[in-house]
């Protein structure tokens, strides 16, 4: 009997272990994907993505020729890249323009050739147009990622200069390496693979788009963006771009005939529509990357049974306590933005909203780098004022119950369950709370 019971328990244990390795239920996967999709759709509406895409498409139409002209001028300064200039332009048009490529390539080459004869003032105008495009891209992504403070003008200048000079040089180097390896293969008679031989017409554009958009989402916004978040947004944008490309070609070649409406000018409106749709996809990927932290935070709050009110109160108290500690320790610079992010473990959007409310109420002050200090003596700042700054009503239930964040429980229990006394606790008293001090 004992052996049978042991065998039965062992079998049940193995079954339980096997069940733990089974995939998540499809219903749960669909619910998770659905909740994230709804969050992204709301963010697309909030940020007015159609308007941003239209602005970028119009600016890109003006800046396309200046950008290519600047890139070719930079390559012309290096004799080794002379043979790669035409190949680079043709490859860009072939990769990213799905409709009437030959006409668009001819027009671009004509405009670039005309730009080569411009005076110094004309070159300055071309450069300014290219910089305006980069400014528009940066401001759009900063808005999507909720960046409150833009880069310093000098930092912007360095970033833009790096993009305008480094991008063409890297592309020229890639094409030169490709030509060099192809020449070796023909000379030696062996199958030396060129990097561009491996990037077939099917895989090349998606891989390039995935890499470029990942770097775009990581480097352009003036805030840290995790690689996984940027890669996820880039993957969404790349897949959407591939689907959009097929749909666009089907509509443009079968459904709507631009030649009938515009005749010889048909390439221009089609190209403008394609640029608008392409920027809409790029911005959608940026919104996806920006909303991942907020979605993860919402899931954690749901699992912990903590509502939005308690989460905002927790963030506000952690920020105020960190500022008070910096003040008490004589740190003139205050609690840094990086320290606050690590302390609250909160997405920038949620933290920025709380900081804005506290700043507006005069409870803290912020410097240009985002560091914070109390707006006045911590002994004169009460929990009730923090609640009022966040426009929150006092939590219901017993002190330390579900409405109160865990980190406040010890400090609030010192009030003996008296709400009035609890809400009158000063920021200095919260700093002195043992569990709070241990956590922070």
Swiss-Prot record:
Keywords: Cell inner membrane, Cell membrane, Membrane, Transmembrane, Transmembrane helix. It is a multi-pass membrane protein. The keyword Transmembrane helix applies. It holds the Pfam family Virul_fac_BrkB. Coiled coil: none annotated. The chain crosses the membrane at residues 29-49, 61-81, 117-137, 157-177, 201-221, 224-244, 264-284. GO terms for cellular component: plasma membrane. Belongs to the UPF0761 family. NCBIfam families: yihY_not_rbn. This is UPF0761 membrane protein Rru_A2625. It comes from Rhodospirillum rubrum (strain ATCC 11170 / ATH 1.1.1 / DSM 467 / LMG 4362 / NCIMB 8255 / S1).
